[in-house]
């Protein structure tokens, strides 16, 4: 009896990779219409913002950004922003920069539309918060670029996968902060609001 024999010594072939690949392809083909519907509003907002940002003249955007930089961080940051924006235009990357900015605005918009309602639900239901907490932990632990692999597989190549990956990574802080902010409102403030005739939704706002 040869005790050195191992399963790999026998000519047995298990097409596991082919089974997995075939099932994934079939599932993706069947679910393609669903993911197109999901990506449709993202594409609409993204394309609209990209068109608007590329339509606005360079001097106007320059003035707006430099003014915002001055108002938020002072003259030094405003000068730095001015030099940076001029440099971007000189190296002929202005259109790409506006596309990136449109992606950021789109991701922020959808994060707010999804995150704030979920945060309100989490603040009103301890059970929902307990269920949601480990999911948010996983979403924040995994690096953002890791999301691109399944997202590209589901939504295809383009700008939309980048926006979806950004939404997934940026969503947990909005949900957590909304939940925490509502939970930290004192009972006295809530009672005062109810006494003035406010509904719970208005108090949350």
Question: What feature does the model see in each segment?
Answer:
Residues 196-197:
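Glycine/proline-centered hinge or cleavage motifs at structural transition points of membrane proteins
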Residues 103-106, 111-114, 123, 137-173:
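Generic hydrophobic transmembrane alpha-helix motif, especially the helices
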Residues 33-47, 60-71, 123-132:
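Short juxtamembrane and helix-loop transition motifs at transmembrane-helix boundaries
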Residues 204-205:
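Conserved small/polar residues in nucleotide/adenosyl-binding loops
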Residues 65-70, 85-95, 107-136:
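Transmembrane-helix boundary motif in ABC transporter permease subunits
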Residues 43-54, 94-106, 129-132, 136-140, ...:
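Alpha-helical membrane-interface segments at transmembrane helix boundaries
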Residues 2-57:
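Interfacial loop/helix-cap signal at membrane boundaries in integral membrane proteins
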Residues 58-64, 75-87:
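Hydrophobic mid-bilayer segments of alpha-helices in multi-pass membrane transport proteins
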């Amino acid at each position: 009896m040869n005790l050195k024999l191992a399963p790999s010594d026998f000519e047995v072939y298990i097409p596991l990779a082919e089974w997995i690949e075939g099932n994934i392809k079939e599932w993706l083909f069947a679910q393609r219409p669903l993911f197109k519907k999901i990506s449709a509003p993202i594409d609409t907002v993204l394309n609209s913002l990209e068109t608007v940002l590329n339509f606005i003249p360079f001097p106007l955007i320059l003035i707006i950004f430099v003014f915002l930089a001055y108002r938020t961080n002072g003259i030094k940051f405003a000068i730095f922003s001015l030099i940076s924006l001029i440099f971007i235009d000189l190296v002929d990357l202005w259109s790409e920069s506006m596309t990136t900015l449109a992606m950021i605005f789109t991701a922020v918009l959808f994060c707010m539309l999804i995150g704030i309602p979920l945060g309100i639900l989490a603040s009103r239901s301890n059970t929902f918060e307990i269920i949601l907490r480990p999911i948010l932990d996983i979403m924040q632990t995994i690096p953002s670029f890791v999301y691109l692999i399944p997202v590209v597989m589901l939504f295809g190549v383009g700008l939309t996968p980048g926006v979806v990956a950004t939404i997934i990574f940026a969503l947990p802080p909005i949900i957590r902060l909304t939940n925490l902010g509502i939970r930290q409102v004192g009972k006295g403030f809530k009672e005062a609001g109810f006494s003035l005739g406010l509904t719970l939704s208005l108090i949350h706002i």
